[in-house]
Amino acid sequence: MDFRSSIRNTSPIVTNLIIINSLVFFAQMAFGGMEPMSKVNDLFALHHYKSDAFRPYQLVTHMFMHGGFFHLFLNMLGLWMFGGLMEKIWGPKRFLIFYFICGLAAAVAQMANYTYAYWGIDHSILSNEAAAYFQEIWLRNATIGASGAIMGILAAYGYTFPNTQLFIMPIPFPIKAKWAIIGIIAMDVFGGIANSSKDDIAHFAHVGGAIAGFLIVLYWNKKNKTNFY
């Protein structure tokens, strides 16, 4: 049996998502979308709702853009490793809906973080000009990547297969999935609180996607549901 054909037949959504994300990445490179202030990012990355660059469709389009090859590679690797199995269990339609809900939840969480930072600037210790300057900086921030949706998949995997042993580099011994996922989420929470946007990682988007993924599978299991619809 042809291996590539087997993958397409068993995980069509995962396969197509990887293809689409890869094609979008090549399009980004071709049209200058790797630059933070590029027109491509203005149009399709997720901006704060008060930004002049914000468009509602960015809640979806940002999920298909990436900031570099390594960013794309890690997200697609996680999608392939964990998403393929979840798609086989749930079926393509259910998996696709799950994926987009987690991605949208990640966008909402990141938007909430932007809003908190925007309104949290202390006007009592800054001049009006300085406060306006820092608020303008926040309005220029933009989020891209499928990481929030991938974190939702990881959370679902950790809930569904909590005792599966995972090898995570550079840790030299296996870790149960439930502890690995909890550890990753905890690092994102800490990273978001400690660093805000200074490391260019949308930590709260990751957390939002993970929480959405966990709540969805928790609801399914409690209600013994087989569909969203």
Feature annotation, model-predicted:
Residues 1-229:
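A detector for small-residue-rich transmembrane helices and their helix-helix packing motifs
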